[in-house]
Amino acid sequence: MKDLNLYLIRHGQTEWNIKDQMQGSQNSPLTQDGILGAKVTGQHLKNVPFMQAYSSPQQRAMETRDYIIHENDNVIPTFELADLREMDFGTWEGQHVPMLKKEVPEFNTYLTDPANFDASVNQGENYLEVLSRMKNALTTIVQNAPEQNGNILVVSHGTVLRLLLCVLNGGDWRLHRDEDYFPRMLNTSVSVVNYQQSDDQTEGQFSVKFFNNVDHLNQK
C-alpha cells in the first residue's frame, strides 16, 4: 500500500507579483516579504519528515523550496521538475495586468473563460496543456517516491496549482478562475494532497486534504 502526502506550496511573493506583471516562464526576485514567507512556512513545516523536495526549475520556486527545507532538521534531497513550471504566457510575459485587461480582449477570456481561451493569441499555453503536464508531474513524483509512505514537498506556481487543485478536488476546470468557485493560490500557501495506491492497483487515487492555507503566515 502506497500512502503519500504531497505538500503543494506556491512560491514566495516576487517583485513582479507586487507590480502586477505577468511572470510565466520569466522570473523576478523574491521580495523581502517573499523570503520571510518562505522561512515562516519552513518553520511551520519543520517537523514534517520530508523524503524529497521538488520545485519547478524557475528561480522563485527553487529559492522558496530551499528556504523552506533550510528550516527542517532532516537532510532532504532536492529535485527540479520542468512540468511544475508556471503557465507559459508567451508575449504577455512582463506586461502589466491592468494594461492587458484594458487593451487585449483575449486576456479577459484567459481570466474568465478558460474553455474558450485561445493561446495562439499570445503564443503561450492553454489550460488543458497545463493541466496535462501538472498531472504528469504528480505521477512522476509519486512513482519516484523512495518509500511507500511519507511526505514530499512540492513548490510550484499560482496559476498551475489553482487549476490542478480545483480538478483534484472534483471541480470543473472550466470554472476554476471564478473566485466564488475556487480561490486563487496565495504566496507560500500550503495545500496537501494525499495519494493512495493499494498493492493490487496499477493506478492510485489523489485526494485533496486542504488547500490554500495561510494560517501560519498570520502568525509571523
Outline where the language-model segments fall:
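Short glycine/proline- and acidic residue-enriched helix-loop micro-motifs
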Residues: N108-E129
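Active-site metal-binding loops of divalent metal-dependent hydrolases
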Residues: G12, G158, V214
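Loop-to-helix element that buttresses phosphate recognition and phosphoryl-transfer chemistry
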Residues: Y7, Q13-I68, N122-K135
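GST superfamily/GST-like fold recognition
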Residues: G158-R162, S189
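His/acidic metal-ligating clusters that form di-metal
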Residues: N136, A145-P146, I152-T159
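Phosphate-coordination/substrate-recognition cap region in phosphate-metabolizing enzymes
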Residues: V40-N108
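Acidic, low-complexity terminal tails and accessory targeting/binding regions
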Residues: K2-D3, M87-M99, Q143, E147-G150, ...
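Beta-strand elements within well-structured catalytic alpha/beta cores of enzymes
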Residues: N5-I9, Y54, G150-S156
